Swiss-Prot record:
Residues involved in abscisate binding: A73, D74, F75, S76, T77, E78, R100, L101, V102, N103, Y104, K105, S106, E125
Gate loop, short sequence motif: residues: 69-73
Protein's UniProt keywords contain rRNA-binding: no
Entry keywords, A to Z: Abscisic acid signaling pathway, Cell membrane, Cytoplasm, Membrane, Nucleus, Protein phosphatase inhibitor, Receptor
Record's keyword annotation contains Cytoplasm: yes
Stretches for region START-like: 3-160
Domain characteristics, as noted in the entry: Upon interaction with ABA, the 'latch' and 'gate' loops change in conformation leading to a tight dimerization and the creation a surface that enables the receptor to dock into and inhibit the PP2C active site.
Signal peptide positions (record): none
Protein name: Abscisic acid receptor PYL13
Known role: Receptor for abscisic acid (ABA) required for ABA-mediated responses such as stomatal closure and germination inhibition. Inhibits the activity of group-A protein phosphatases type 2C (PP2Cs), selectively PP2CA, in an ABA-independent manner.
UniProt cross-references to InterPro entries, sorted A to Z: Plant_def-hormone_signal, Polyketide_cyclase/dehydratase, START-like_dom_sf
GO cellular component labels: cytoplasm; nucleus; plasma membrane
Sequence motif Latch loop, location on chain: 99-101
Length: 164
């Protein structure tokens, strides 16, 4: 952990996806397959645990993620802190890698949309992260929010394709 004097920031990104909750959750909860919808992820190798896959225990699983070239990092090591299939909550922490997202922790919550509970899903991804030295809180939030927004847009496209 960094010094308690380290500046931290937090934000949330909300995306409504035109797909039923069970489909959206089945993709999001697959800790061992982030590349299914996270387009900056080139590959994922499970270091420990089952990643929440069928028959595998999820909580405490650790994955090594290789990122695509051109991204401002090469790899990330991440731990699944919580995976709750009843409340549709997933918590992930970044515990290593060659990036600037120190002490990053995200919580993703999935709920059926009040507009159309059978056909729409609302995904809320909230996070907290240290503000890297030499960077502003606003720039950090802008960067992370855009990655999350891109991933959730990709998730929406994937679910739409799967429903055809």
């Amino acid at each position: 952990m960094e010094s308690s004097k380290q500046k931290r920031c937090r934000s949330s990104v909300v995306e409504t996806i035109e797909a039923p909750l069970p489909l959206v959750w089945s993709i999001l909860r697959s800790f061992d397959k982030p590349q299914a919808y996270q387009r900056f992820v080139k590959s994922c190798t499970m270091r420990s645990g089952g990643g929440g896959g069928k028959g595998g225990e999820g909580k405490g699983s650790v994955r090594d993620v290789t990122l695509v070239s051109g991204f401002p990092a090469d790899f990330s090591t991440e731990r699944l802190e919580e995976l709750d299939d009843e409340s549709h909550v997933m918590v992930v922490s970044i515990i290593g890698g060659n990036h600037r997202l120190v002490n990053y922790k995200s919580k993703t919550k999935v709920v059926a949309s009040p507009e159309d509970m059978a056909k729409k899903t609302v995904v809320v991804e909230s996070y907290v992260v240290d503000v890297p030295e030499g960077t502003s809180e606003e720039d950090t939030i802008f960067f992370v929010d855009n990655i999350i927004r891109y991933n959730l847009t990709s998730l929406a496209k994937l679910t739409k394709k799967m429903m055809k």
